C-alpha cells in the first residue's frame, strides 16, 4: 500500500503517460539526453576554449548546492515516515544491521580487488620517480585534512550539536541520526502522533516537486562542471598516466558488471536492467562528479522499484558513507601505483596493513568531489612505507577518476538497497521486475511536473 503522496505522484504520472500516448515526448525533452548533450558540449568548450571553460565552475558548484539544499528534508521525510509506519521497531535494528554487514563485506572485497589488480597489472612499474623530486606542497592541504580525520572524531560527528544544526550544515549522517530517532519516537507515541505523520507525508509531495524543479537545472550544472574540468586540467593530462586511469576504469567496470552483477543475479534481478533504470541519475553523477547530486532521484526510484520506504531511507544515506566500492578500489590501486612509481617495495605485511588502514579510513568519506583523494591521504599518512608526497603524481588526474569512483559508488548503493530489502522481506519482486523491465511507467523525478516547459 503506497502512502498518499506516492499515490498523488502516480496520478500525475498517469496523466503524463496518457498525454504521451497522444503525442510521444520528443527525445530532446528527456533529462538523460539533455545531460548527455551538456556533458559533450562542456568537453568541447573546455578543450577548445579552456579560459572560458575554467570560468564556468560556478555553474556546477551552484547546481550541487541546490541539490544539497534539498537532501536533508528528503532524507528526513523518507526515513521518519518510513520508520513511523513500522509496527515492529526491531525491524529498524535488523535493517541497519544487515546493511552494515553488506557494506563491510563488499567494501572489503572492493579493497581486495584494487590490491590484486595493482599487483597483477602494476600500472606504476618502470616510472622510477624520486619522491624527493615531487612537489609535496601540492598535496599538503589534502594531507592536513586527512590528519584531522579520526575514527573517534567521525563517530562523534554523527551526533549533531543542535537539532537544527544538522539540517543547517547538510550533514547526511547527522540528518539520518535525527530522522531515525524522530521516526522511532513517532512509532512509540502511536495514534497520538498520526496528525504529525499525516503532515509529514503531505509535505513529501511538494518537497519532491521542488526536487523536480531543481533537476531541470541538471544540464546546466553538468555543462559547467565538465567545461571547468577539461578547461583546467586538459585532455592531454590524461595521456601521461593513462595506464592508471585505464586500469581503474576497467577494474571498476568489471566490479560492477561481474561482482555486483553476480550479486544481482543471485537476488533475482539484472545489473544491466538496473543500470538502464537509473541511467538519468548515472549521467547526472557523471556530469557533476558527485553522487550526492543524484541522491534524491535514487531514493525515489528505489521506492518505485518495490523497496519499502523504511529500507530505502536507512540504506541509501548510510551507504553514502559506508558503502563506497569505487572509492575503495581507487584507494588500494592508487596506493600501490604510487609505491610502484617511486620504486618503494611493499611486502605482503605492508599490503595487509594498507588494507586494514584503508578499511577504517574509507568509512565516512563523503559523496562529494575530492573526498576520495583526502581519504587516500589519510590512509598513506598512517602507512609509513608509501610516501605521501607521491600523491602529487595523481593530483592532476584525480578529477578524471572521480567520475568513475562516484558512478561505481552509486551503482553499489542501488544494488545494496535492493539486496537488503530482499533479505528483510521488504521487496515487492513483481514491482521490481516491472520497473527494471520497463513495464511500469516509472519516471524520474523531473517528470512529476505536469505541464512541461515550452
From Swiss-Prot:
Its main location: membrane. It comes from the Bacteria. InterPro entries: C4_dicarb_transport, Na-dicarboxylate_symporter, Na-dicarboxylate_symporter_CS, Na:dicarbo_symporter_sf. The chain crosses the membrane at residues 33-53, 66-86, 101-121, 148-168, 170-190, 210-230, 243-263, 354-374, 377-397. GO terms for biological process: L-aspartate transmembrane transport. One of its GO terms (cellular component) is plasma membrane. It is a multi-pass membrane protein. Keywords: Cell inner membrane, Cell membrane, Membrane, Plasmid, Symport, Transmembrane, Transmembrane helix, Transport. Responsible for the transport of dicarboxylates such as succinate, fumarate, and malate from the periplasm across the membrane. HAMAP family: C4_dicarb_transport. This is C4-dicarboxylate transport protein. It comes from Sinorhizobium medicae (strain WSM419).
Amino acid at each position: 500500500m503506497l502512502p498518499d503522496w506516492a499515490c498523488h505522484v502516480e496520478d500525475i504520472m498517469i496523466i503524463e503517460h496518457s498525454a504521451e500516448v497522444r503525442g510521444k515526448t520528443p527525445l530532446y525533452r528527456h533529462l538523460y539526453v539533455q545531460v548527455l548533450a551538456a556533458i559533450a558540449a562542456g568537453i568541447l568548450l573546455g578543450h577548445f576554449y579552456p579560459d572560458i571553460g575554467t570560468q564556468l565552475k560556478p555553474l556546477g558548484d551552484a547546481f550541487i548546492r541546490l541539490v544539497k539544499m534539498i537532501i536533508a528534508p528528503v532524507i528526513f521525510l523518507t526515513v521518519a515516515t518510513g520508520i513511523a509506519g513500522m509496527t515492529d521497531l526491531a525491524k529498524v535494528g535488523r535493517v541497519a544491521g544487515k546493511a552494515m554487514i553488506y557494506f563491510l563485506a563488499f567494501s572489503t572485497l572492493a579493497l581486495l580487488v584494487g590490491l590484486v589488480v595493482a599487483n597483477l597489472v602494476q600500472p606504476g612499474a618502470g616510472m622510477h620517480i624520486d619522491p624527493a623530486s615531487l612537489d609535496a606542497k601540492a598535496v599538503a592541504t589534502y594531507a592536513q585534512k586527512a590528519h584531522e580525520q579520526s575514527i573517534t572524531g567521525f563517530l562523534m560527528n554523527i551526533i549533531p550539536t543542535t537539532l537544527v544544526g544538522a539540517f543547517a550544515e547538510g550533514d547526511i549522517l547527522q540528518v539520518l541520526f535525527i530522522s531515525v530517532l524522530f521516526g522511532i519516537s513517532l512509532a512509540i507515541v502511536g495514534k497520538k502522533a498520526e496528525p504529525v505523520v499525516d503532515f509529514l507525508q503531505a509535505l513529501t509531495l511538494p518537497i519532491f516537486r521542488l526536487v523536480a524543479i531543481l533537476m531541470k537545472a541538471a544540464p546546466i550544472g553538468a555543462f559547467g562542471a565538465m567545461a571547468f574540468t577539461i578547461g583546467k586540467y586538459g585532455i592531454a593530462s590524461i595521456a601521461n598516466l593513462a595506464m592508471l586511469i585505464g586500469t581503474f576504469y576497467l577494474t571498476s567496470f568489471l566490479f560492477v558488471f561481474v561482482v555486483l552483477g553476480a550479486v544481482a543475479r543471485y537476488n533475482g534481478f539484472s545489473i544491466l536492467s538496473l543500470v538502464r533504470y537509473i541511467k538519468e541519475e548515472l549521467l547526472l553523477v557523471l556530469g557533476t562528479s558527485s553522487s550526492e547530486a543524484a541522491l534524491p532521484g535514487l531514493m525515489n526510484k528505489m521506492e518505485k522499484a518495490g523497496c519499502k520506504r523504511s529500507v530505502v531511507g536507512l540504506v541509501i544515506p548510510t551507504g553514502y558513507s559506508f558503502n563506497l566500492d569505487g572509492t575503495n578500489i581507487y584507494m588500494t590501486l592508487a596506493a600501490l601505483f604510487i609505491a610502484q612509481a617511486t620504486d618503494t617495495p611493499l611486502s605482503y605485511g605492508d599490503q595487509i596493513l594498507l588494507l586494514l588502514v584503508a578499511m577504517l579510513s574509507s568509512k565516512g568519506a563523503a559523496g562529494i568531489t575530492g573526498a576520495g583523494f583526502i581519504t587516500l591521504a589519510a590512509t598513506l599518512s598512517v602507512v609509513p612505507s608509501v610516501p605521501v608526497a607521491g600523491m602529487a603524481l595523481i593530483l592532476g588526474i584525480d578529477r578524471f577518476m572521480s567520475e568513475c569512483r562516484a558512478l561505481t559508488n552509486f551503482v553499489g548503493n542501488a544494488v545494496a538497497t535492493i539486496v537488503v530489502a530482499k533479505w528483510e522481506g521488504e521487496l515487492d519482486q513483481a514491482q521490481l521486475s516491472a520497473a527494471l523491465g520497463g513495464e511500469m511507467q516509472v519516471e524520474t523525478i523531473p517528470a512529476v511536473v505536469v505541464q512541461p516547459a515550452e
